[in-house]
Design a protein with these regions (language model features):
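Substrate/ligand-engaging "lid" and interaction regions
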Residues: 1-6, 10-347
Length: 347
C-alpha cells in the first residue's frame, strides 16, 4: 500500500506518518523544505519521541520524499498511482497544492487508471477534504471530474494530537503526546484497505466528533490559558494544576459536555471519561506549551462559530447553563500582548 503525504512537518511525521507506518503503508512525504526533504531521502529511519510518564521512542522506516517545487513529474506520477493521499499542511495551503493534485489526477485519467484512490485532509478545519475537492475540481474538465467522482474518494476527517513547538539538532526528530485521535467518514472511502488504518475511528457522521473536540479540547485549552494568563502563570501544565484555574475551566467543560450530550446524544459517562482524559493531557509536564501561544488571536477565538460563542449560543437555545462559558469570555478580554495584533485591537 502506498501513501503520498503532503506536509513533512511535525504533524505529518509525528502523527499521520506514525499511524500509516504502523498500518503497513509506504509513505512518500511531499514538502518544500529542502533540509527536511533531503534528510528524509538520505536516511532510512527517523525518531518519534512520545512524551508520556515514561518517554518512549519509536523508529519509523519505509518512507521517501519529494520536493514539491523541484520534482513535479515524479509527484504527478505518484498521485496517479497511490491508494491514499493525505495532508497536514494547514487549511490556507490546500488551494495551493490543489493544482498539483489536479495535474496528477489528469495523468490518472489520461492513463485510464481505474485503481481506486482516497484523498483525506488532516487539518484543523471542518469538511477539509470536501474543500480540497472543490479546489481540485477548479482545474479539471467536466469529463475529468466525472472520472474522479467515480474512482476517487474525498472522506472528511478530524485529527487531535498535541505536538508542541520544538527545535532539535536532528531535524527529523519529533516529540508528541501519547494521545492521538483520527476520525474518518466511513461512507466516502473508496479503497477497502483505507478502512483498516490502525487507531483510526471510522464513523458515518463526523460532525459530533468535530464538535466534541472543538468544545472540549479547544474550548478547554483556551479557557485554561486565558485564566492562567490573568493569574501570571506561564505554562499550560502549571495552569492545569492550579486550583483557581481548574475550578473555572472544569466548570466550562461540564457545560460543554452537557451541551454535547443533549445535542448529539453522547453518553454521560463517555463524556466524563473524554473530559477527564483531556484534563490529564493538559497536565502533562513533559509538554512544554506556553500560555501566551495559546492566548494569541483572541478575536478569532471569539468568532460566531468558534469555541466560545457557538457553545454559548447553542446552550442558550437548548435551555442549558452557559454562565461558566460567559465568565471565560471575560478573561479573554484581559489578555494583553503587544506582539499579538488582535490583542492590541481589543484594547
Amino acid at each position: 500500500m502506498k501513501n503520498l503525504h503532503f506536509g513533512a512537518g511535525n504533524i505529518g511525521r509525528g502523527f499521520i506518518g506514525e499511524l500509516l507506518n504502523k498500518s503497513g503503508y509506504h509513505i512518500t512525504f511531499v514538502d518544500i523544505n529542502k533540509d527536511v526533504v533531503n534528510d528524509l531521502k538520505r536516511r532510512d529511519t527517523y525518531t518519534i519521541r512520545i512524551l508520556d510518564e515514561n518517554i518512549e521512542e519509536v523508529e519509523l522506516n519505509n518512507f521517501d520524499a519529494l520536493n514539491i517545487a523541484e520534482e513535479k513529474e515524479q509527484l504527478y506520477t505518484a498521485i496517479s498511482e497511490v491508494e491514499l493521499i493525505t495532508t497536514s499542511i494547514g487549511p490556507n495551503v490546500l488551494p495551493i497544492i490543489a493544482k498539483d493534485i489536479a495535474e496528477g489526477l489528469k495523468l490518472k485519467v489520461e492513463n485510464n487508471n481505474t485503481k481506486l484512490l482516497d484523498i483525506i485532509t488532516c487539518e484543523n478545519m471542518i469538511s477539509g477534504s470536501e474543500f480540497l475537492k472543490t479546489e481540485v475540481f477548479k482545474h479539471l474538465s467536466e469529463q475529468e471530474q466525472e472520472f474522479v467522482n467515480k474512482y476517487v474518494g474525498f472522506p472528511n476527517s478530524a485529527v487531535d494530537r498535541i505536538v508542541p513547538a520544538q527545535k532539535h539538532d536532528d531535524v527529523l526528530l519529533v516529540e508528541v503526546e501519547k494521545f492521538c485521535e483520527w476520525v474518518i467518514e466511513a461512507d466516502k472511502i473508496k479503497v477497502e484497505s483505507n478502512r483498516n488504518i490502525e487507531q483510526v475511528h471510522y464513523v458515518e457522521d463526523l460532525n459530533p466528533f468535530i464538535e466534541r473536540k472543538l468544545f472540549t479540547v479547544n474550548t478547554g485549552h483556551a479557557t485554561l490559558s486565558y485564566i492562567a494568563n490573568y493569574l501570571g502563570i506561564e505554562l499550560v501544565s502549571d495552569g492545569a494544576k492550579h486550583a483557581d484555574v481548574r475550578k473555572d475551566f472544569i466548570a466550562v467543560l461540564e457545560e460543554t459536555s452537557a451541551l454535547l450530550e443533549k445535542k448529539w446524544g453522547f453518553d454521560k459517562a463517555e463524556m466524563e471519561a473524554y473530559r477527564n482524559k483531556t484534563i490529564k493531557r493538559f497536565e502533562n509536564p513533559r509538554i512544554v506549551d506556553n500560555i501566551s501561544r495559546i492566548c494569541r488571536t483572541p478575536i478569532r477565538k471569539l468568532g460566531y462559530n468558534e469555541r466560545f460563542i457557538k457553545p454559548i449560543r447553542e446552550a442558550e437555545e437548548l435551555g442549558l447553563s452557559n454562565s461558566a462559558l460567559l465568565k471565560a469570555c471575560s478573561y479573554i478580554l484581559t489578555f494583553k500582548s503587544e506582539e499579538d495584533e488582535q490583542s492590541v485591537q481589543l484594547e
